[in-house]
């Protein structure tokens, strides 16, 4: 039995994760963490009324020796300290929160390696999204002119999405940086061409009704290729989260990307 703590249990992904953990025979919901709530037990929240797990509002309350895996679906401003705390206390981490900076990830990897603890930071837990990133990396070897469009619900706090950034990073591994478009082009409206990552443009859309979607557009002389992925329900991410929780204890390093476990 894997004892799991969920941080960010009141968010959309945290909500789904609580139910996934509670309904998985291999996992035990050992607690939840949120520093700004008043509840003492998850069963005080209507949608979790049939569950029983303590709510921790301070790191000092958490029985670190009784927690095997820390799942984090919080907010960009909180995730670094959460993951640092877990790794320093030799708790494996499964992180879906976006917003970690490259230098923070480097530091967290060092902590994980020092303590021999496994961890996963996944920009996306959807299998289709992982496949999109791998397909895009392969395509970029032959079609290096590329732009990325990511589309999410209008409550998402960060832009571009972690999935889009990771897609760009994977493409950059096989593609030499070069200027796309007309070198003399100008923007009549600031930001019209989107964000720029090593010569690739990334465009972010935020609209109600969307969940998580991405398109990677490749162009070459006389042809074009579009790779698209759609997540219509957050339930689609739970297969990847469960896989990560089950496997992460077998590792002694912090990794980025669900593909490392597949």
From Swiss-Prot:
**A GO molecular-function descriptor:** 4-hydroxy-tetrahydrodipicolinate reductase
Pfam families xref list: DapB_C, DapB_N
Q: Which UniProt keywords apply?
A: Amino-acid biosynthesis, Cytoplasm, Diaminopimelate biosynthesis, Lysine biosynthesis, NAD, NADP, Oxidoreductase
Signal peptide span: none
- Fetch the InterPro entries from UniProt: DapB_C, DapB_N, DapB_N_CS, DHDPR_bac, NAD(P)-bd_dom_sf
Gene Ontology CC: cytosol
Gene3D superfamilies, per this entry?
Answer: Dihydrodipicolinate Reductase, domain 2, NAD(P)-binding Rossmann-like Domain
Primary subcellular site in the record, as a coarse category: cytoplasm
List of residues binding NAD(+):
8-13, 96-98, 122-125
* Pathway assigned to this chain's UniProt record: Amino-acid biosynthesis; L-lysine biosynthesis via DAP pathway; (S)-tetrahydrodipicolinate from L-aspartate: step 4/4
The UniProt record gives the binding positions of (S)-2,3,4,5-tetrahydrodipicolinate as 153, 162-163
Q: Tell me which EC number(s) this protein carries.
A: 1.17.1.8
Q: Which family does it belong to?
A: Belongs to the DapB family.
Protein name per Swiss-Prot or TrEMBL? 4-hydroxy-tetrahydrodipicolinate reductase
């Amino acid at each position: 039995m894997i004892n799991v703590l969920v941080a960010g249990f009141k968010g959309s992904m945290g909500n789904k994760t609580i139910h996934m953990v509670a309904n998985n025979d291999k996992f035990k919901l050992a607690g939840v963490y949120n520093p700004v709530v008043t509840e003492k037990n998850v069963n005080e929240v209507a949608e979790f009324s049939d569950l029983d797990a303590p709510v921790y509002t301070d790191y000092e309350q958490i029985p670190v020796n009784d927690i095997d895996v820390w799942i984090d679906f919080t907010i960009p401003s909180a995730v670094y300290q959460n993951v640092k705390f877990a790794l320093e206390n030799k708790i494996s981490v499964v992180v879906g929160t976006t917003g970690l900076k490259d230098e923070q990830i480097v530091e967290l990897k060092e902590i994980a390696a020092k303590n021999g603890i496994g961890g996963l930071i996944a920009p996306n837990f959807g299998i289709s999204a992982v496949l999109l990133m791998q397909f895009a990396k392969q395509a970029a070897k032959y079609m290096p002119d590329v732009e990325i469009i990511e589309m999410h619900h209008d409550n998402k706090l960060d832009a571009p999405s972690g999935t889009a950034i990771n897609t760009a990073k994977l493409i950059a591994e096989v593609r030499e940086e070069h200027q796309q478009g007309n070198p003399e082009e100008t923007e009549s409206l600031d930001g019209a061409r989107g964000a720029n990552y090593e010569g690739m443009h990334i465009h972010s859309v935020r609209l109600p009704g969307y969940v998580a979607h991405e398109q990677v557009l490749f162009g070459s002389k006389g042809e074009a290729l579009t790779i698209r992925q759609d997540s219509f329900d957050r339930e689609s991410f739970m297969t990847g989260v469960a896989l990560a929780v089950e496997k992460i204890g077998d590792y002694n390093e912090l990794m980025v990307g669900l593909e490392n476990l597949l």
